[in-house]
């Protein structure tokens, strides 16, 4: 039993424990928020997907056989998992229409990754797809950078809204926001390291796991600090977005004052 197998096994146990903690924390929330709960189960599914990936790596020995072979499997699994985590984060911040746009964009990028993978196998007749690996890595980085930019925009907008309209403690939200961005940036930085050197993975891997743990804890803390007034703000924002859309496309009426309505 070598050190790589032990690292993969530790990551597998870590993902299972974190998925269990995030799922079970549902029993300890004071107020239930449908948007937050959707995000919770997105993150749980993503963590379980990452755990399954480590089982595959241990069972078939892709990473042990070759760094590039293991990296191909990593990208195929990491992309949808990190997209799910990103959408779970974004779901708390954004309106439903914006979330649908993000889902379509992430799905399109992952479809492109699958297409590159299939073309690479067809050309090289093996999982060693050579230059296709770097195209897949580039697409993965594009996906994560896109998610980061969208999340940061919504976080700034929502923080300003909460400061203006809600007299609540913003510290849990600020911690959650920072942890969200940190875990996504580490995803961008860790993937090239995972491709070029398994040795460096022993250093970067624990750092990513600690960041993921901190994110999960701040996510749970955010749910524990939730109060119903925030859900009213969410509904108000969505209603404003819906009214703006109807007015823009002629699907509704626009009133200057309450008396005219």
Please report, for each region that a protein language model flagged, where it lies by residue.
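Membrane-proximal linker segments that couple transmembrane helices to downstream signaling/catalytic modules
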Residues: 218-261
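Membrane-interface helix-boundary motifs at transmembrane edges
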Residues: 27-42, 65-67, 90-103, 126-129, ...
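Hydrophobic alpha-helical transmembrane segments of multi-pass membrane proteins
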Residues: 10-28, 38-61, 76-83, 108-119, ...
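The cytoplasmic-loop to transmembrane-helix boundary for the fourth helix
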Residues: 90-119, 131-140, 165-183
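Alpha-helical transmembrane segments
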Residues: 8-9, 66-70, 129-147
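Membrane-water interface of transmembrane alpha-helices
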Residues: 18-25, 81, 145-159
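Hydrophobic alpha-helical transmembrane segments and immediately flanking/interface helices
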Residues: 75-85, 197-222
